[in-house]
Amino acid sequence: MDFLTGGTSDWPDAGFPGIKINPDSLVPQIVNEETCAQALAASTDPGDLIFVRLVEGHAAEAAELLAEARYNDPSSLRLRIFEADILRVSNRLDRAVDLFRQLLAETRGTPDEAVIRQHLGQSYFASGNIAAAVEAYAKALDLRVAGSADAALIYASTVALQRARYVLDLTS
């Protein structure tokens, strides 16, 4: 059963052209290969290529790119998030959750807490810990609303929370 109907136009933005978040799986997915390829060709940010390779399911290549990028910018939160996402995509879900919990401890009370909670929710959802995913998504949404975040981020958190609650209700 599709959570949102009507094609991909209602899917939340994933933060890169041509990529949106599948509202059923809550995983980023390429929805327009041409747009994605053009944006990637124009980008000079190594994080963009890492993200696209992750979305494509190429975790090993993403990990190699990440190692080089982290060497040049070891404290980058975005790159540390990619490290945990690589673990998630590689089905090392417990390790991904542990790393996101560590990042959460480091970002609690900062503007970055919401993005970490959103990613933590995604890892919980992927691991089947739906109750924890609901909690993480709810807190991410609360923080984004309280912080007057971009509407696209609030929408992404709303869709993720609704989907996680729906799945939780199915399993209850």
Residue ranges and their predicted role:
Residues 48, 82, 119, 126, ...:
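"A position-specific structural signal for the A-helix of alpha-solenoid helical repeats
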Residues 37, 70, 104-107, 141, ...:
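A conserved position within tetratricopeptide repeats
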Residues 92-95, 128-131, 159-172:
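Alpha-helical linker/edge segments of TPR/alpha-solenoid repeat scaffolds
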Residues 1-67, 71-73, 89, 169-172:
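N-terminal alpha-helical interaction modules that lie
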Residues 41, 75, 112, 152-156:
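Structural signature of alpha-solenoid helical repeat junctions
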Residues 47-56, 67-115:
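Alpha-helical adaptor scaffolds
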